[in-house]
Amino acid sequence: AEKACELIEVEYEVLPWAIEIDDAIKPDAPILHDHIQFDGKPSNIAGTLEHKKGDINKGFSEADVIIEREFKTEAVHQGYLETHSCLVSVAADGRATIWSSSQGQFMVRAMTSFITGIPQSSIRAIPAEIGGGFGGKTIVYLEPVATILSKKSGRPVKMVMTREEVMRASGPTSGSKSKVKIGAKNDGKITAAQGTFYLQAGAFPGAPIRGAAGCCLAPYEIPNAHTFGYDVVSNRSKVAAYRAPGAPIGAYAVECVLDEVAEALKMCPLEFRLKNLIKFHKIRLKSLPHE
């Protein structure tokens, strides 16, 4: 099979592309999907998420110290030791059995059924013990392909990605571009916080903006806050989960700014955080009680 693949010659028509977030959101950026609209026109911004609490302008006007910083993080792969692999056998009666290196059988069964057209009731998915996943194996790549090949050939089919194929074709976590602004009074109380987060989705929508915009301020009681997340498509592999998807991006930016605010106030960073720690049953930014 590998020798046969080497004989295939592919001719590509090279089109304009956008790799980085800044390239994808600029006014003259090449549009990946015409049906994706933002502000009434085709755009690479596939979705947004906004959280508000209090009066952000009033909060900053009350602050004695204000720190604003921008951050950029690159896409990072989960780096699991075992590559994606599966073994699929489709019997004469059309019932399929899938053994795969995955993080869940229900997802494998549902997605394989959706792609192949085989009813879920005719698919048995067996997740094997895996050599690491960290969120990167909560999606299927090989299972539907192996299922179709097994059905056509009448024989079991085994597929294993090479390390190069994993890095080229499977989903890493999002790269990001963020801006965070935090204000506090001289006594150490935070009066306002604002965060804007652009996350790479890859070629199709689905960046974990909820984790970045929704969780970045979760540990703290802040009377005036505003966060905004942008789901940005670009010419990259579709992203996948990676250990609390999106949350480290938001937390990293916020915590870095908190360190600078504490330094400007000449406070211990730990004491500064404890002073602003949210209490049980207080309302978080997402209008939910902290429990």
Residue ranges with predicted function:
Residues 1-291:
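Structural alpha/beta core scaffold segments of enzyme domains
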